[in-house]
C-alpha cells in the first residue's frame, strides 16, 4: 500500500526541483499530447480533466494546444499546484487540490488525461471505473504510468546484494509496477475500446547516487508501507554491484518502462 501522507509530503518538497529532473516524465507527456493533437482540432471547445497535474507541465501544453478548451487540473500536493499556477499560459484552467482516489466528480469530460501518476494509486481499477463513468460518449481516458521493467537494474542489484549477504527477508529497494498485460486487465471496462502500448527510456548517470538523487528530486522515492531497505551495509553492497554490473561507456544506466493506455468510451451513434 502507498502511504499517501508520506507521498504528499515528498511531492510538496519536490515541487521546486521537479521540472529540472523529470526528463522521462516530459517524454511521456509528449507522447500523450501527440495523441490528443491528432484527435482534436485546435479550436475544439472540449472539456478536459487532468489528474496529477503536478507543476503544470502538461497543463500548459494542453492550454496551448486547445485554447478554447475548459480544463480542470487536479493534484493532491499544494506546492505542486502553486508552481503550476505560475506558468504563463494556464488562463483557461481551474486548479483543485484533491486526492484522485477520493474524487467526487459531478461532470462528464471529453478527455481525461494523466501523466506518470497512476502508479501512486492503491486501487487503480476502482479509479478507472469511476473515471470511465464520467467520460462523455466517444470521450477518451488517456494516461501513462510506469511498468514492471522500471529500474530493473536497481532491483537486480539489490537482489544480488541480498544474495551476497545471505539475507532472506522481503525487504525491497523500491516500488514494483504493473506489467503491460496486468494493466490491460485492470483497465477492461464495458463499452470501452482499450489500447495499451509501451516503450523503454534509458537514462544515463555518472554514478548510482546521482541516479537516486534524481529520483528524490521528483518525489518518487519508495512510499510503500511495506518493508524497505534500511541496512547501510546492504545499501552499500547494492551500490557497488549496480556500478559493477550496469556501467557502460556513457555511465550507469537506468531503465524507465513507460506504459501508455487509452480507453475510448463507445456509444450508439
From Swiss-Prot:
Put simply, this protein is called: Malonyl-[acyl-carrier protein] O-methyltransferase
Q: Which Pfam families match?
A: Methyltransf_31
Q: What is the organism field in this record? A: Bacillus anthracis
Entry similarity comment: Belongs to the methyltransferase superfamily.
- The encoding gene is bioC
Keywords linked to the UniProt accession: Biotin biosynthesis, Methyltransferase, S-adenosyl-L-methionine, Transferase
Chain's role: Converts the free carboxyl group of a malonyl-thioester to its methyl ester by transfer of a methyl group from S-adenosyl-L-methionine (SAM). It allows to synthesize pimeloyl-ACP via the fatty acid synthetic pathway.
Q: Which Gene3D superfamilies does UniProt cross-reference here?
A: Vaccinia Virus protein VP39
Q: In which pathway does it act?
A: Cofactor biosynthesis; biotin biosynthesis
What reaction does this catalyse?
A: malonyl-[ACP] + S-adenosyl-L-methionine = malonyl-[ACP] methyl ester + S-adenosyl-L-homocysteine
